[in-house]
């Protein structure tokens, strides 16, 4: 049974990933700064930045599902990816990250990203930048097993769980309706499928509804 640590397990997406992992028989430990709000019995109440290498290296997979929505905490998104990446460098533990959509490319030359577009809200740019900082670090780190999973642009917290999705890579992809959208529930399925399969090591992938 694989052991998985889920950082940000109390969050909306983190808790769905926890549930999906538990349903598939993983040995799951949650981590957050507040009291445990999930259905896992193993829980670490502390900041991600207080973790040490010996703690995280004993897991097969570390999930980074940390959320942040205030201007003060948004930098923690990228900083947490970097911090965990440094802790896990040189180990066999995989780091799988709940990513952002803003850094997905929208042209074949891969020179223009979603967050460079005129319709991308200014309020979202700090969050996208923080995610991008973390992704850049991952791509530049050779001795780390990682996968960064970008959701669609429209990431629907209360969306329907359909059980189906479509995968892409560095470029923005659309569903059969020409939309970039996915529910939190379907994203969690795709996320844990990648933990199951370990198919896209050292890559960014993206996911959209069918």
Question: Residue locations for each model-derived region?
Answer:
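Glycine-/Pro-rich loop/turn segments that contact NAD(P) or position catalytic residues
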Residues: 72-160
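NAD(P)H-binding glycine-rich loop region in Rossmannoid oxidoreductase-like domains
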Residues: 37-93
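Substrate-positioning beta->alpha
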Residues: 130, 178-192, 203
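Glycine/proline-rich active-site loop of Rossmann-fold NAD(P)-dependent oxidoreductases
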Residues: 141-143, 156-164, 194-203
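N-terminal Rossmann NAD(P)H-binding glycine-rich loop of SDR-like oxidoreductase domains
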Residues: 4-24
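N-terminal Rossmann-fold cofactor-binding loop
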Residues: 31-35
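A conserved pocket-lining segment of Rossmann-fold NAD(P)-dependent short-chain dehydrogenase/reductase
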Residues: 166-182
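Conserved beta-strand positions in the Rossmann-like core of class I SAM-dependent methyltransferases
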Residues: 5, 29, 147
